């Protein structure tokens, strides 16, 4: 899936996560190398004032990728607010809400619907189909 996304978005794939680099490295292992790590942001390793929903982490990643717009995939209301705030500051971030991960998926889905999230998916594995990307 990552290879297909990289092809679709000209290798401009980065991560903005609340977790730290070591935690992400441990869970993603070799997959992490598929992302532009240099322009990714690992908020656990940053100062607390950058915590979600502060949009500066996403804006920094977008600037590093030389991008004026992005698709931001997340599973929380903080992620949704972060994307909205980035857009308000001139960095168009289309939010894709993932509701099937974690606790209370039905409640999360209802909140995403209530706040007119443009893309709402049960799992990130549905993303290539929604974006009409051929999986490799």
Where are these regions (language model features)?
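Short amphipathic alpha-helical segments and helix-helix/interface helices
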Residues: 1-7, 58, 62, 109
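Alpha-helix termini
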Residues: 5-9, 32-33, 84-94, 135
């Amino acid at each position: 899936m990552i290879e297909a996304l990289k092809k679709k978005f000209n290798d401009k794939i980065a991560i903005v996560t609340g977790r730290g680099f070591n935690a992400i490295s441990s869970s993603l292992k070799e997959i992490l190398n598929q992302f532009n790590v240099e322009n990714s942001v690992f908020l656990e390793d940053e100062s607390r004032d950058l915590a979600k929903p502060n949009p500066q982490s996403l804006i920094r990643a977008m600037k590093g990728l030389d991008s004026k717009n992005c698709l931001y995939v997340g599973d929380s209301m903080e992620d949704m607010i972060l994307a909205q705030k980035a857009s308000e500051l001139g960095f168009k971030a289309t939010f894709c809400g993932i509701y099937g991960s974690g606790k209370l998926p039905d409640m999360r889905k209802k909140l995403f619907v209530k706040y007119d999230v443009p893309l709402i998916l049960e799992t990130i594995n549905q993303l290539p189909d929604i974006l009409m990307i051929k999986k490799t």
